[in-house]
Regions:
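Conserved beta-strand-loop-alpha-helix hinge in the C-terminal portion
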Residues: 208-239
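Conserved catalytic segment of ABC-fold P-loop ATPases
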Residues: 196-204
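Conserved ABC nucleotide-binding domain
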Residues: 119-136
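ABC ATPase nucleotide-binding domain signature region
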Residues: 28, 42-106
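Walker A (P-loop) phosphate-binding loop of P-loop NTPases
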Residues: 34-40
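GG-anchored amphipathic helix commonly corresponding to the ABC/SMC/Rad50 NBD signature/C-loop
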Residues: 139-159
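A short, flexible loop at the N-terminus of ABC-type nucleotide-binding domains that lies
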Residues: 1-26, 55, 71
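H-loop/switch region of ABC-family ATPase nucleotide-binding domains
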Residues: 187-190
């Protein structure tokens, strides 16, 4: 898969969405913004399910300019799309190392689990141990581990992420990692800094994609300023977690 194309559906009132098509490519980061209830999660679900126009929104999703046949849709979706939700937990009761070895074997990937763990620990402030139980990991540790797993073990070219800024991890490193592995990354966010990380963002309202905005030069300059503030906030968070004074 090299491109994913969204074809318009309809909003909550039944009106057609105001775009012809939206083409997204591997290696691209695209953010999705809008008020609560604007349709962000529904858009993500349409992409995850490779919607054929029979769903609530009427949207259609093309892969490399073609529809995925109904009988293949479930299998293709499972292999092509990885979804990092806000609340994640493991049902497998085993250690981190055993999980990584098992997943690598299932995917027939020759990779050292220590390399995956090193990547995970680069984006979470609380280190993960190889012999630690999956079920004892915090929410941030879990998402960091899954981001590293998706980047290095999982072959899924499409990654859907819900509000990464709430995960307690370094979002810049996490998203840059996924892009560097040629993933198409779509991030639902309410945060201006996260939204401006992408060259393009989709604006949701009333259940529809109301606008596709390309980041302007002024917004790029604003992003640089917000990145400085983000780095400062990260440093203060580190001091706070260590029990040190902030001023």
């Amino acid at each position: 898969m090299q491109t994913l194309t969204l074809l318009p559906g309809r909003d909550k009132a039944g009106n057609p969405e105001p775009f012809d098509q939206i083409a997204l490519r591997r290696g691209e980061l695209c953010t999705i913004v809008g008020n609560t209830g604007s349709g962000k999660s529904r858009l993500i679900k349409d992409i995850e399910q490779l919607s054929d126009g029979t769903g609530v929104t009427g949207r259609r999703v093309l892969l490399d300019d073609g529809f995925v046949p109904l009988e293949q849709r479930q299998a293709v979706s499972t292999s092509l799309v990885a979804h990092l939700g806000q609340n994640m937990c493991f049902v497998l009761d085993t250690s981190v190392g055993a999980f990584l070895r098992l997943h690598a074997a299932c995917r027939q990937k020759e990779i050292r689990e220590s390399d995956v763990l090193a990547v995970a620990n680069d984006i979470t402030p609380e280190p993960i141990a190889m012999d630690e139980s999956l079920n004892l990991l915090s929410g941030g540790q879990t998402r960091a581990l899954m981001i590293a797993d998706i980047a290095l073990i999982c072959d899924s070219p499409i990654v859907l992420v819900d509000e990464i800024e709430n995960a307690g991890i370094d979002k810049q490193r996490a998203l840059s990692l996924l892009q560097s592995r040629e993933k198409l990354v779509l991030v639902v966010t309410h945060d201006p800094h996260t939204a401006l990380m992408a060259e393009r963002r989709l604006v949701m309202s009333g259940g529809a994609v109301k606008a596709v905005i390309t980041r302007s030069e002024r917004e790029a300059a604003l992003y640089d300023q917000l990145s400085i503030e983000y780095a400062r906030s990260q440093r203060l968070q580190t001091l706070l977690r260590k029990g040190e004074l902030l001023a």
